[in-house]
Amino acid sequence: MKKFSLAFLLVLALAGSSFAAPAVYFTKDISPAGLMAIYEHLGRTPEGKVAVKLSTGEAGNTHYLSPALIGELVKRVNGTIVECNTAYGGSRSATALHRQVIEDHGFNAIANVDIMDEEGEVSLPVTGGKHLKEDVVGSHFKNYDFVLVLTHFKGHAMGGFGGALKNISIGIASPRGKVIIHTAGTKDSGSIWYDKQDDFLESMAEAAKAVSDSLGGGKRIMYISVMNHLSVDCDCDGNPSAPDMHDIGILGSLDPVALDQACVDLVYKAPDGSSLIKRMESRHGIHTVEHAAEIGLGSREYDFVSVD
């Protein structure tokens, strides 16, 4: 009878095991019902005090997620809409100005809205990062038990695209925290412009992981991204380029890396996605997803599940 080493048996066992790719759910139905269907398929029930993280959109921008689209879901989870002030001037750089934008864009009509850095900031530890040791976020972040991340997927002038990873990194950071991310930890005040692009993208991934880690290692957070109004510019732009491609749908996952990867893949598959592809590639946008996977935030492999 042949004898086998423990190492050989371990190799056989590993070879027989299979990686369970995270599910990414998809619907073409960009409506309150479609949004609710994706939420239901995720199978995770928010508990405790629930934050709904989204972008309130710069004054002059009309591409942000509309209250008419998201209102039913926000009420379903009994959520408080949360945002932070910006670090680049504009209409959302100070709380009073930001509150006016929130009112003008209709968010007060569907839920309470919390500007999380209104009373200061707190630090979240970053583990396994190349650039960041901490992620500085709005102090009210600590008041929430669960986060539902509602993202409008679109292009971005600096990141190439804005997806779920950007929404929980730059989006949850205080103005000082935003500078830290944009400059890859080299400074915490002044201009956000930085010439080491990959370092900035990697810092976004590291900040996103800090947020996920703080929420039960990703157990108290879920992600839904809406692919409509697909401009090359972000909702933080008050004068964005008009979209020149068709709306695609709504996607959801418990894995933000898989979700962003799936959104990017759908842009590449679209027959009219050339402008957004050019924007993403010119900024090396996929590198945020690459680094997020490298540091263990999630998987670039996924199981695409249509719910239509």
What are these regions (language model features)?
Residues 21-308:
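Extended, low-polarity segments enriched in aliphatic/aromatic residues
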